[in-house]
Amino acid sequence: MADKGMTYSFDVRDNTLVVRRSTATKSGIKISYREDRGTSLLQKAFAGTEDEFWVELDQDVYVDKKIREFLVEEKMKDMSTRVSGAVAAAIERSVEFDNFSKEAAANIEMAGVDDEEAGGSGLVDNRRKNKGVSNMAYNLSLFIGMVFPALTTFFSAILSEGEMSIWQNGQAIMRILALADEDGKRQTRTGGQRVDMADVTKLNVVTANGKVKQVEVNLNDLKAAFRQSRPKRSDYRKGQGSKATESSISNQCMALIMKSVLSADQLFAPGVKMMRTNGFNASYTTLAEGANIPSKYLRHMRNCGGVALDLMGMKRIKNSPEGAKSKIFSIIQKKVRGRCRTEEQRLLTSALKISDGENKFQRIMDTLCTSFLIDPPRTTKCFIPPISSLMMYIQEGNSVLAMDFMKNGEDACKICREAKLKVGVNSTFTMSVARTCVAVSMVATAFCSADIIENAVPGSERYRSNIKANTTKPKKDSTYTIQGLRLSNVRYEARPETSQSNTDRSWQVNVTDSFGGLAVFNQGAIREMLGDGTSETTSVNVRALVKRILKSASERSARAVKTFMVGEQGKSAIVISGVGLFSIDFEGVEEAERITDMTPEIEFDEDDEEEEDIDI
């Protein structure tokens, strides 16, 4: 602990944090700065004590208990006015360190620091156990940890706490962010032509009481808040010799998030997402009215990731058993060479030979990957909680930077469980809240729309009107696929027990893969689906179809909703995520009565369950 009668002040000069003591004998204690393996490291030792304070700007923070107490008690009240930038954020995170378990602390990797430099504490040995975390997974964790608090602050002026915690609204926030972060003019297509978009756009959100409302978002203000909160280039972890820019790494992080947003599984499964760092869709659709623009994030990842996938294929072919692999290797090699932008890349590509040894082949490939601004060809398995759960978790004062949820599925589930929406419930709460969440996730988002279903369902008034669909007229007891919608397959299956009349027929809906394309949110149709009776344009058949969608999709949350309805009003904590309500924690209810089977499940590839980084 600090000596009594001795005061400390903090100052920042470039990447150096200076700590000054007011006594004549101890003053100007300076933190050394060095470059090590591409990582900016600040090393601090309080002279005259055994306490050490380690800060690594592009990673997380570890401080021992005494220094933490000193920071809290002596300086945290006015530190914000004296310390700025990444150093301030690092010290603030150190104060929050007690919020996390010892296991989480051990998972924070201190790259580039040996045990002798760390004072022989053994901390580095524990952290090196987590070497399997890839650069991309780490960078995304850092990106989320710095950007999401700013997003939470920005949207808290537009959305209530309850509205921000609803899963579908979290997805909408990320789409509207992608729309805002454009360098040039924002444009959309109307009638086959590009038109400029206004700086203020409308966003459709679900309210906590089960209604749908529109809010206005200033895209320029959102863009400014987003770019100000992004990590700097020096904060990211990069491969040796990497020329990746701040924008390129940030765009990769946004592409990963958009991949999670567009995941087909999110139509049905709440909780943790398993994804890979390559293979992204080429476009996304925002929830803004009529907005459908190509994503520069996904375009960036397509340009880089496409080469990465080809290089992975070349390595996989090289390591495969003997056969006709030389010809295939040569074809892919020519494809990669055609995408090269510099002479160096062309020479490196030509130097890849199927007969080379493993070490030589890998060195050439790593250099080539770096020149394309991508990590060496590895595939990393990551776990991402729902966007809304992350925002809710941060909104409650937590930090994600000390949690390696990108690799640790348990921490990802922890975020889901702890991101709770506490609702002051009264007798007006009904099943409509859960049904609204389900309806918006399956019908009223960019994945699908009321218009598409209405056009595609046989028997509805607008069936096959103004739609490019390769279908035949429905026949009894058959399954049909709607195509040509720039969508994945949507199947409508006629059940055998139904009548011969198409208008009375009962349909079962199966949705596969991701939706995208020209889906537009239709408020009137959604209100009709929810039974408001405010629109007369939607046919009875569509309402019946949506009821079946709601019934099928809400099976997971049915037990939770039922238990909630019979529980004590106003004394419950409720979680809205995924398809709706996936977990409920009752206050004052015996532990044995709590619902435990609604926790999001973690999915592993059977072959990869024990692997951290997988060389393809």
Swiss-Prot record:
Transmembrane segments: none annotated. Keywords: Capsid protein, Helical capsid protein, Host nucleus, Viral nucleoprotein, Viral penetration into host nucleus, Virion, Virus entry into host cell. One of its GO terms (cellular component) is helical viral capsid. A motif (Nuclear localization signal) lies at residues 230-233, 473-476. GO terms for biological process: symbiont entry into host cell; viral penetration into host nucleus. Its main location: virion. Pfam families: NCAP_ISAV_hel, NCAP_ISAV_N, NP_C_Orthomyx. It is found in: Virion; Host nucleus; Host nucleus, Host nucleolus. Homomultimerizes to form the nucleocapsid. Binds to viral genomic RNA. Protein-RNA contacts are mediated by a combination of electrostatic interactions between positively charged residues and the phosphate backbone and planar interactions between aromatic side chains and bases. Encapsidates the negative strand viral RNA, protecting it from nucleases. The encapsidated genomic RNA is termed the ribonucleoprotein (RNP) and serves as template for transcription and replication. This is Nucleoprotein. It comes from Infectious salmon anemia virus (isolate Atlantic salmon/Norway/810/9/99) (ISAV). The gene is Segment-3.
